[in-house]
Amino acid sequence: MSGIAALQMYDLPALRQATDALWTGIAVALRARGQGAPESLAREVDPDDIWRDPALLFAQTCGYPYWNRLRGHVRLVATPVYSAPGCEGRRYRSAIIVRTDDPAKGLSDCKGYRPAVNARDSQSGHNALRAAVAPLARGAPFLGCGIETGAHLASADAVAGGAAD
């Protein structure tokens, strides 16, 4: 049996070819060491459902859920290094966005805005926003009621579509 492999965190349509190439390289390396590996990635599975599946071979998670609920159940084998601006070495970057016609010039202008976040256990998609807002909040509510979207792209779509600010 070759197991389940999923790289869903950043498997956006524009990156699909690169994600497949990454998996192909990983699968070839695994097979060269005698480990079975699926030909293709599982894209139609709920990421939360695969973490305790005995067939899980390889998957990608955000660091926050790894440290808070997955550590001890799965083994960390690598941390990707991306070449996006602000992501040099071990660093990563989160973007806080508003609609193109929004007058906000900075985060301090966003008091009362309704955020769209990936999930409450996402470092880049939730906790980074909390950390950025904390100094502005001064112990009082700063942002309005937000929504959880499940993915970075879905959060951007929620802002663009008006479901969030």
Region roles according to the model:
Residues 45-50, 152-158, 164:
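Short, hydrophobic alpha-helical packing/hinge segments within bilobed ligand-binding/sensory domains
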Residues 1-73, 79-83, 87-91:
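N-terminal hydrophobic or amphipathic helices and topogenic motifs
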Residues 35-36, 73-74, 112, 142-143:
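A generic structural signal for alpha->beta connector loops
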Residues 75-76, 133:
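Glycine-rich, phosphate-binding/catalytic loops in enzymes
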Residues 52-59, 113-114, 160-165:
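Alpha-to-beta junction loops
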Residues 5-25, 89-157:
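Bilobed "Venus flytrap"/periplasmic-binding protein-like clamshell domains
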